[in-house]
Amino acid sequence: MNQKLLLTLVAALALVAGVGMGGWFSTQSAENETPQYLQTFPEPRQLAEVTLLNQHGETVTNELFKGHWSLLFLGYTFCPDVCPTTMAALGKIYPELKNISTDSPIQVVFVSVEPKRDTPERLASYVEYFNPEFVALTGEHKMLFPFARSMGLMYAIAESTDNPNYLVDHSASVVVVDPNGLAIGRFKPEYN
């Protein structure tokens, strides 16, 4: 299946799901009344090389993204709003995404940018709630920050970590990574 067709199907399924990715992840074009669900990058972006831990405590690298279509979302398990909403939206459309006929399977990858509190055990519990097939990753900030930037995403600890309930500001986009391990676009939230 070609890239354009797959992305169109992902967007259509998101719209049908009636959650985020149809309206919440959509933007309207000024010249066209048809919603544009995916902002494609002018050129595919090479992901920064990383070594991270998955929810099983296993070390993973960028090889995780090779041979798969990946929907990648940055967040953290203590996030009070956008993370559970986005993960629920991904969980809702994932069964339909898996049914898309493609040579490269689709995976959802949650990358925690808060390794202090998000242990592999906590990540396992978190992603399993939304779908046990989802992958969760975390690692040191020296790996996470360049990785996020390579996709055009950002995050920052918003307040003192002395407060046990501190927040982390982070991008709310879901990045699409192709089977070659290149970021090709993102679903951006709409801020109305």
Region spans (language model):
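Short, internal strand/loop/helix patches
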Residues: 124-171
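N-terminal targeting signals for export/organelle localization
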Residues: 1-49
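Thiol-/selenol-based redox modules, centered on thioredoxin-like
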Residues: 161-192
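Short active-site neighborhood of thiol/selenol oxidoreductases, capturing the structured segment around
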Residues: 60-86, 90
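Thiol-based oxidoreductase modules, predominantly thioredoxin-like and allied folds used
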Residues: 103-118, 133-142
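Conserved helix-turn-beta segment immediately C-terminal to the redox Cys motif
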Residues: 68, 87-110, 128
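Extracytoplasmic/secreted envelope proteins and their assembly/folding machinery
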Residues: 84-94, 120, 124, 141, ...
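Short extracytoplasmic
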Residues: 36-72
